[in-house]
Amino acid sequence: MDCKSYVFLWKNHPLADRTEIHGEELSDYPFLSFEQGGNDSFYFSEELSSMNDYSQTVKVNDRATMVNLMVGLYGYTLCSGIVCEELNGGDYRVIPLSDDSPINGVMKVGYIVKKNQILSSVGKLYIEKIQEFLHAAQGGLSN
């Protein structure tokens, strides 16, 4: 599934009140990259970090550190726009990255199914709901 890029940051970040953020506005703040390790982590990246050069990058390997650095350093990351407030709390914002931003790109959201296995009805429903959300929130990018 294709989706637009969003900036994920703390609610008191200097850019948190914007309706859209241009990539150049982020240059004074550290980009936070979530690293899961392994040889193929580039291909399974959770953000667009692998496609861009950033003036400041901090690599973390757990989400608690990432959200703490969003607060302590005014750091940010890029995401699909799908953020669960129940997991992250209400202290964070998701703001669209402008279409003409040099760091913008289309993200691919995918899923893995074990070979020769059929996706369960719950799995199918989950994928359907993600597609509906992305279509409604992002102007109907292709699936």
Where do the model's predicted regions map?
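Flexible hinge/capping segments at coil-to-helix
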Residues: 1-31, 35
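Beta-alpha-beta core module
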Residues: 3-4, 65-115
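Active-site-adjacent beta-strand anchor residues
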Residues: 8, 33-34, 59-60, 77, ...
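Secondary-structure junction motif
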Residues: 23, 29-52, 81, 119-128, ...
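Conserved beta-strand scaffold positions in the cores of enzyme catalytic domains, especially
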Residues: 31, 57-59, 94
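Short beta-strand-to-loop elements that line the ligand-binding cleft
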Residues: 52-65
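A late-sequence structural motif
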Residues: 97-139
